[in-house]
């Protein structure tokens, strides 16, 4: 007899069976969960993300776990576990357990890591017999949000094609099925997080240490607590930690990579060499130099790229970034004999372009940095260790390295809250907004750039204007924001 899992796989992949026909042959232990899905695609630029109790719920996580399990299993060369981790949000326990129930209902073994950074899940997935990984986190979003990120067996973000297969299953209105003979098991494997910590230090063993450096770390009450300070201390640095406890009520609140003010003050107060701010799941990081000046992903990519180029380790002197990368960065990198390729915003697009072109280094202005030598997922801790090591090896301060790099073009970024998801994702159909963009682009010509886009992770439309001077950038930003507010966010 063909198992119910096999028949569901056939439905998801081939569309060969109808919903009603399939339901008649399933030995179901679970009634179909009542879930409400938006009309627009569920997966955004960084997995599935939304407010808990609105978009995200335990029933939905159960369904996602089941259908993700079916799809991962169908595409696996051989059966293996799924690695599951989470950040510190109050809702993460609930979603992780529900998702694990779905995965085990799909017949898969779950290795549960508990609290850990997203790149820890990606690394352990790629270095084990796992067929996939899942992280429960909403990254830099506020505490009331949460999300589900799914990784393939290689530790990279799941492809859009496989995401579409999962969503097809979710929208098929089929019951979750399982029986005693095909249930998977859930195992706590907290000890594996230590393996990730050791891997972070490995590139510099017997080469570079951070002795004599004072580093301030803002852990954002999130997934990097404990781990990041211990790794930096073991590398020899004197560490001062901010927000270094797992706190689901305060994760990312006025701290971390989206709020650098406390880190800037602490770096100057303690006369530190540099500071790092992580987001809630530690897949991104921003830095602060000794003067308190912010150092974003553009600068990190430039400095890391220049180091690799000088070592003849950067294929074709190529860096992949996004449409958000500053023109100043691009022009400076070109002057170094390098080439910059831009993608849509989202590290999954950067990852795809890196694979396509064979690029070693890529990332985003927001602090997602990918180096294919270490994997294909942004890793805030690895990036921070690399930048600290570059500073130590250079013999000069991070402030001096930044002064020697490039001048940015004035760039303004404003977020306009648009609660209606369908209106937000279809904003390009709004004629007045499109006309305003065309007018601004014509006025600035090749001396500036405009980017308007719906966020894939937050209920906002982002308006970015880059211009030859701050006055122009401010003027056109205000004009475009007014149009978006008037026509899309009444």
From Swiss-Prot:
Point out residues bearing the modification Phosphoserine: 139
Q: Which GO terms describe its cellular component?
A: cytosol
Annotated SUPFAM superfamilies: Phosphoglucomutase, C-terminal domain (SSF55957), Phosphoglucomutase, first 3 domains (SSF53738)
One Pfam short name: PGM_PMM_I
User: What is the catalytic activity of this protein?
Assistant: alpha-D-glucosamine 1-phosphate = D-glucosamine 6-phosphate
One of the entry's Gene Ontology molecular-function terms is:
phosphomannomutase activity
Its family remark reads:
Belongs to the phosphohexose mutase family.
Q: What is this protein called?
A: Phosphoglucosamine mutase
**Species of provenance:** Nostoc sp. (strain PCC 7120 / SAG 25.82 / UTEX 2576)
Lineage of origin = Bacteria, Bacillati, Cyanobacteriota, Cyanophyceae, Nostocales
Name the gene that codes for it: glmM
């Amino acid at each position: 007899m063909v198992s119910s899992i096999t028949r569901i796989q056939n439905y998801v992949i081939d569309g060969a069976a109808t919903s009603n026909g399939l339901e008649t042959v399933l030995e179901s232990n679970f009634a179909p969960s009542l879930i409400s899905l938006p009309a627009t695609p569920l997966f955004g630029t960084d997995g599935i993300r939304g407010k808990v109790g609105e978009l995200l719920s335990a029933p939905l996580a159960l369904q996602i776990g089941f259908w993700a399990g079916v799809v991962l299993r169908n595409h696996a060369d051989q059966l293996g576990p799924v690695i599951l981790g989470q950040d510190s949000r109050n809702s993460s326990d609930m979603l992780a357990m529900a998702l694990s129930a779905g995965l085990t209902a799909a017949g898969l073994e779950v290795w549960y890591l508990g609290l850990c950074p997203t790149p820890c899940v990606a690394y352990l997935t790629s270095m084990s017999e796992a067929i996939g990984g899942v992280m429960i986190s909403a990254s830099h979003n506020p505490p009331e949000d949460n999300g589900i990120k799914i990784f393939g067996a290689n530790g990279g973000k799941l492809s859009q094609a496989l995401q579409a297969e999962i969503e097809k299953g979710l929208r098929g209105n089929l019951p979750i099925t399982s029986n005693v003979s095909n249930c998977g098991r859930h195992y706590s494997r907290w000890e594996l997080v230590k393996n990730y910590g050791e891997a972070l230090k490995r590139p510099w063993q017997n080469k570079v240490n951070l002795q004599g450096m004072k580093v301030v770390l803002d852990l954002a009450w999130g997934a990097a607590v404990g781990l990041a300070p211990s790794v930096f201390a073991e590398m020899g640095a004197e560490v001062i930690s901010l927000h270094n406890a797992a706190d689901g009520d305060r994760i990312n609140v006025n701290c971390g990579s989206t709020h650098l003010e406390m880190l800037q003050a602490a770096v100057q107060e303690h006369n530190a060499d540099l500071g790092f701010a992580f987001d809630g799941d530690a897949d991104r990081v921003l830095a602060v130099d000794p003067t308190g000046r912010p150092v974003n992903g553009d600068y990190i990519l430039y400095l890391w790229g220049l180091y690799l180029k000088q070592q003849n380790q950067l294929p074709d002197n190529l860096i992949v970034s996004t449409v958000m990368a500053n023109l100043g960065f691009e022009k400076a990198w070109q002057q170094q004999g390098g080439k910059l390729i831009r993608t849509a915003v989202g590290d999954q697009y950067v990852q795809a372009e890196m694979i396509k072109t064979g690029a070693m280094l890529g990332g985003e202005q927001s602090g997602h940095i990918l180096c294919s030598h270490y994997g294909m997922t942004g890793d805030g801790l690895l990036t921070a260790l690399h930048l600290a090591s570059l500073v130590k090896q250079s013999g000069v301060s991070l402030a001096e390295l930044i002064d020697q790099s490039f001048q940015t073009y004035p760039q303004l970024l404003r977020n306009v809250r648009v609660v209606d998801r369908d209106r937000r994702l279809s904003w390009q159909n709004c004629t007045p907004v499109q006309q305003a963009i065309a007018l601004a682009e014509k006025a600035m010509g090749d001396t500036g750039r405009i980017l308007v886009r719906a966020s894939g992770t937050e209920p906002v439309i982002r308006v970015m204007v880059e211009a030859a001077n701050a006055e122009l950038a401010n003027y056109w930003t205000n004009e475009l924001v007014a149009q978006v507010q008037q026509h899309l966010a009444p």
